[in-house]
């Protein structure tokens, strides 16, 4: 940990705060003006509102693009011979996109590709992964979607040589199983260790208004670990929780409990959305969800909160009852259908306020605000550049609420807390000379 180089900015002037000009997309004004302009902010809004069949499972465009390249090499039986030349070409495209994200060749080939805030060493990442799993020696099983996802994660981790100032996490399926509370001492130890070197935030869709106790309950075991290891050195001050995507901010005090941060300390970094617009988004969503329940005969209910609305099963499935009926479960494809219907209606009503309609796997939620806005608030509050911020999450498809963070942060796409631990272990040991990235395949 001693060698993890974390740089901070002494003055707010060190980071330009973007244009003061107001436009319909000003909630995406970023901390370094030279990376994102108004057209790119508009592009984020358009992709946040995109709806198509292609957003279904494992349809990430960049990963599928690489899968097809590797698969063509595999089919032609020349992956072992030609892989270096192919990786060099891919890396050149990545570098071109890093310098010119709006007009790169990669952008023309993959129109929804995110922004690269670091140069991705895909060649080194592939060979690291191949050294352990020997992809190039396989005869009948071509590289898969998840393998390419892991390789891109490795490339992103290997690009962090300058260190990080802010590490953010999704909650469910990233830090703990969906619907559960945090309960992993090893993961807590990794987060605690990194907290001594950087700011860490959990950016979650969970919306309990400003009720710090409810967030405290979900994270109780993590905060207990902080009470033993992060109070004396004051590193507990580096921990944040952003609830409701971007609507409620909490910090940790010296008793390792959460408290609500006064709005006057951070609300000016957030786009103002008036009450009528909030209600319009929720009303449109509620009408769509009522129609979905009727059309598909769902055993589900609508839950409406201050700035969010959700479709949840009437009963959560039990893992212990084998013969229990499962007809109350909502099919993944039905949730996707509902997300697309809601986005379509919001677009028709020409609403430009930040929002997020996402498929949670077992339920669906629509929030006023989104994780991109949540990350941008933290970046501005802490005066941190986007290339020094990394978000770890499991919902990076177009219908997932982590997707917008690709336009304002580095990202690592995990599928479970075990993969999160592997990523953190690699980040902790990144600048050690004998460092070998932790490679964790999905089924291990």
From Swiss-Prot:
What's known about how pH impacts activity here? Optimum pH is 4-5.
Q: Which family does it belong to?
A: Belongs to the ISN1 family.
Q: Which domain of life is it from?
A: Eukaryota
Which terms in the GO cellular component ontology are assigned? Answer: cytoplasm
Location of the active site: 170, 172
**GO function terms (MF aspect):** ATP binding; IMP 5'-nucleotidase activity; magnesium ion binding
Q: How does it assemble?
A: Homotetramer.
- Write down what this protein is called: IMP-specific 5'-nucleotidase 1
The protein's matches in InterPro entries, at most eight in alphabetical order, are given as:
HAD-like_sf (IPR036412), HAD_sf (IPR023214), ISN1 (IPR009453)
**Origin species:** Plasmodium falciparum (isolate 3D7)
- What's the Enzyme Commission number for this chain? 3.1.3.99
What's the gene?
A: ISN1
Question: What role does it play?
Answer: Specifically, catalyzes the dephosphorylation of inosine monophosphate (IMP) into inosine. By dephosphorylating IMP, plays a role in the purine salvage pathway. Does not have phosphotransferase activity with IMP as phosphate donor and adenosine as phosphate acceptor.
Notes on activation and inhibition: At physiological pH, allosterically activated by ATP. ATP binding is a prerequisite to magnesium and substrate binding. ATP binds to 2 of the subunits in the homotetramer inducing a closure of these 2 subunits and the release of the C-terminal loop, thereby activating the enzyme. In this conformation, the enzyme can bind IMP and magnesium which ultimately leads to the release of ATP. At pH 5, ATP does not have an allosteric role and is dispensable for magnesium and substrate binding. Inhibited by phosphocholine and D-myo-inositol-4-phosphate.
Q: What is the effect of changing residue 176 to L?
A: Severe loss of catalytic activity
For binding IMP, which residues are annotated in this chain's numbering?
170, 172, 178, 204, 207, 308, 363, 371
What changing residue 395 to L does, per the record, is:
Loss of catalytic activity
Q: Which residues bind Mg(2+)?
A: 170, 172, 394
User: Which positions does UniProt annotate for ATP binding?
Assistant: 132, 150
User: What effect is documented for mutating residue 403 to A?
Assistant: Partial loss of catalytic activity
Assign the protein's first listed, main location to one coarse class. cytoplasm
Q: Does the keyword Chloroplast apply?
A: no
Any one biological process term the GO annotation gives: nicotinamide riboside biosynthetic process
| Native organism taxonomy | Eukaryota, Sar, Alveolata, Apicomplexa, Aconoidasida
**Which Pfam family is one of those matched by this entry?**
ISN1
Q: Keywords for this entry?
A: Allosteric enzyme, ATP-binding, Cytoplasm, Hydrolase, Magnesium, Metal-binding, Nucleotide metabolism, Nucleotide-binding
